[in-house]
């Protein structure tokens, strides 16, 4: 009988040592690029009050209605594992009074949780890398964050992706548009797919990104959101596009693009690969100028994005050739006296930052040296009863098949040579 409790939960995955180098690579590239633009890393708790997400993401969203991991704790509080990070960062901005400083440029990388049907590129525990530029209404901020996403993807060798961008205007502009959109769609209600019917009166804007071909045909004749934007919204979007042109960033204006979270306004964007996989959106973001005020903070404009790490890895894993993690030194010992003395050598290796592995098998020297070769070590330090008697150390250079003996005190003085 299969031991289900010994398997990871459905929609979760162990990240094994042979995979973790890719994660480190992404983190290091993000740190380098974002630090250059003065973005600082922030880490928020993975659990938050459920009300935070209900107030920010929107009561009618799929995340709130179907996907949140929510439980009541021992203090009878409703707690949720974060389904996304922007709301948590907005909460941190308020609770830590970060609004007393100038513009906050923040970035994060961590796990998120949504109860979704697991499939390729979609898990119930997944990871996002994201940035938030908080405190500026300037369209240059929108352009900066998009530019950083573009820079990071280029550095990670992502090819053949397209930036889609739109303006979804202000809340007031969208309200006017929603009324006319619902009026138009109600004429074709019987022909809409079931998801779109369900969204008609709760979240009609989400119908715009329906994957159903019949629904998309109906939408071709629907009112266009861009005609409802006022002069200020139109000018903001025009400047974002102008700055992207200045940066030679290719983009496509997609007037049907809307984001699935209620807090977005003005600029909305997604970066998609040319994969036929339905999960081909690897980055999504936009402006959220009312969220912080809505959560009880001061009126504060902001813009940001998030990249799905698992989706990103599916694209770059085969293209990235990362250096194998090898050790310089393998330490082979036999006998209690040698195993007492070896700790002085270990401390000397540590002081010189020489990467090593201590054999813990108590097997023969032959087997220990064979293990050193398999690990790709350059040197094998051998310390046994004979070496203890002669007050020396045997060093085997594995890549040159050379072995020599050194007096113990001389060896410690010249241990730095094992770095090469």
UniProtKB/Swiss-Prot annotation:
Belongs to the class-II aminoacyl-tRNA synthetase family. InterPro entries: aa-tRNA-synth_II, aa-tRNA-synth_II/BPL/LPL, Anticodon-bd, Anticodon-bd_dom_sf, His-tRNA-ligase, HisRS-like_core, HisRS/HisZ. GO terms for molecular function: ATP binding; histidine-tRNA ligase activity. It holds the Pfam family tRNA-synt_His. It comes from Gracilaria tenuistipitata var. liui. It catalyses: tRNA(His) + L-histidine + ATP = L-histidyl-tRNA(His) + AMP + diphosphate + H(+). Its EC number is 6.1.1.21. This is Histidine--tRNA ligase, chloroplastic. It is found in: Plastid, Chloroplast. GO terms for cellular component: chloroplast. CDD domains: HisRS-like_core (cd00773). Keywords: Aminoacyl-tRNA synthetase, ATP-binding, Chloroplast, Ligase, Nucleotide-binding, Plastid, Protein biosynthesis. GO terms for biological process: histidyl-tRNA aminoacylation. SUPFAM superfamilies: Class II aaRS ABD-related, Class II aaRS and biotin synthetases.
């Amino acid at each position: 009988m299969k031991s289900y409790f010994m398997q990871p939960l459905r929609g979760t995955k162990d990240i094994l040592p042979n995979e973790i180098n890719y994660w480190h690579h992404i983190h290091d590239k993000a740190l380098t690029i974002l630090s250059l633009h003065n973005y600082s890393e922030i880490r928020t708790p993975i659990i938050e009050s459920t009300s935070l997400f209900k107030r920010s993401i929107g009561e009618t969203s799929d995340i709130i209605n179907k996907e949140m991991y929510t439980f009541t704790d021992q203090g009878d509080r409703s707690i949720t594992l974060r389904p996304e990070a922007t709301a948590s960062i907005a909460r941190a901005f308020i609770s830590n009074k970060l609004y007393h400083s100038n513009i906050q440029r923040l970035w994060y990388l961590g796990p998120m949780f949504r109860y979704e049907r697991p499939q390729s590129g979609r898990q119930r525990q997944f990871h996002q890398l994201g940035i938030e530029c908080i405190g500026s209404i300037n369209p240059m901020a929108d352009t900066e964050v998009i530019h950083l996403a573009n820079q990071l993807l280029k550095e990670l060798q992502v090819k053949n992706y397209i930036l889609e961008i739109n303006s979804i205007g202000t809340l007031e502009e969208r309200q006017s548009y929603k009324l006319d959109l619902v009026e138009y769609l109600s004429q074709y209600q019987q022909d809409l797919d079931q998801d779109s019917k369900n969204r008609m009166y709760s979240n009609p804007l989400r119908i715009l990104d329906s994957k159903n071909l019949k629904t998309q045909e109906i939408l071709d004749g629907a009112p266009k959101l861009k005609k409802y934007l006022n002069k200020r919204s139109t000018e903001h979007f025009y400047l974002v596009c102008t700055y992207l042109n200045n940066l030679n960033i290719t983009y496509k204006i997609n007037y049907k693009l809307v984001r699935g979270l209620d807090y977005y306004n003005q600029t909305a964007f997604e970066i998609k690969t040319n994969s036929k996989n339905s999960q081909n959106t690897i980055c999504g973001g936009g402006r959220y100028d009312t969220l912080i005020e809505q959560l009880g903070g001061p009126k504060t404009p902001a813009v940001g994005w998030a990249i799905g790490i698992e989706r990103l890895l599916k694209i770059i894993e085969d293209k990235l050739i990362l250096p194998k993690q090898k050790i310089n030194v393998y330490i082979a010992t036999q006998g209690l006296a040698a195993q007492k003395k070896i700790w002085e050598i270990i401390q000397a290796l540590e002081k010189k930052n020489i990467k090593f592995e201590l054999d813990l098998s108590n097997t023969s020297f032959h087997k220990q040296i064979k293990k050193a070769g398999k690990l790709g070590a350059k040197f094998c330090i051998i310390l046994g009863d004979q070496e203890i008697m002669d007050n020396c150390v045997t060093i085997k250079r594995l890549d040159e098949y050379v072995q020599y003996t050194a007096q113990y005190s001389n060896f410690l003085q010249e241990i730095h040579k094992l770095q090469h």
